[in-house]
Amino acid sequence: MNPELFAETLSKYNFKLSPVQEQQFKTYFKELVRVNEHVNLTRITDEDEVYLKHFYDSVTPLLLWPEVFAEGAKLCDVGAGAGFPSLPIKILRPDLEVTIVDSLGKRLNFLSDLLEKLGIEGVNLVHGRAEDVGQNPDYREKFDLVTARAVARMSVLSEYCLPLAKVGGKFLALKGPRADEELEDAKSALEKLGGEVVFTRVITLPGSAEVRTLVLVDKVKATPGKYPRQAGTPNRKPL
């Protein structure tokens, strides 16, 4: 998917890229590849692949479920790495207030420099483990929407993400092709953490065999105070 096809595909979903937005994606690609030479950000560096598997993949929830992204909503992206999915979403929807949580300082340094080059405001970068941030009263149950892409299996991911979503908010997981098995394993975790799966959608990225599953979870009740457990425990002992 080259930049032109990317723009054309978005326009079919009523997202017409402005020249500024087109340039932001071009700069994002150039900076990603440049910095990736000395900081491990991605295995994907071919332009067409970055536009498809990073940029387009990141914005698919916004294209398919625009109603989930309310005007001025507070979005938290857990383990965003090089900024996926939240920064491509933010480029399309500058009104969103975005917080990015990542445990690796080098990645956050990349994002900080990138945001300056892109001229993007309204993004808060938080250096820390999701388990610790989820117990911090500044962030706990403060977000309308929490996103995560390719971070951990669903039972673990739920404990990272649901404590950050406010009651009535949502948790959106961007998963691969075998999400059904993960969801089955995560039933107990979701129930304990106050989440309820409302929708899953399997999609294939355009012009490819890449299968993705979008999972939307409602935060129906408050997460008990003991969750998330201390750093490392959710991964070692999933709920």
Swiss-Prot record:
Its main location: cytoplasm. The lineage of its organism: Bacteria, Bacillati, Bacillota, Bacilli, Lactobacillales. It comes from the Bacteria. One of its GO terms (cellular component) is cytosol. HAMAP family: 16SrRNA_methyltr_G (MF_00074). S-adenosyl-L-methionine binds at G79, F84, A130, E131, R149. Belongs to the methyltransferase superfamily. RNA methyltransferase RsmG family. It holds the Pfam family GidB. PANTHER family: S-ADENOSYL-L-METHIONINE-DEPENDENT METHYLTRANSFERASES SUPERFAMILY PROTEIN (PTHR31760:SF0). The keyword rRNA-binding does not apply. It is an enzyme of class 2 (transferase). This is Ribosomal RNA small subunit methyltransferase G. InterPro entries: rRNA_ssu_MeTfrase_G, SAM-dependent_MTases_sf. Its EC number is 2.1.1.-.
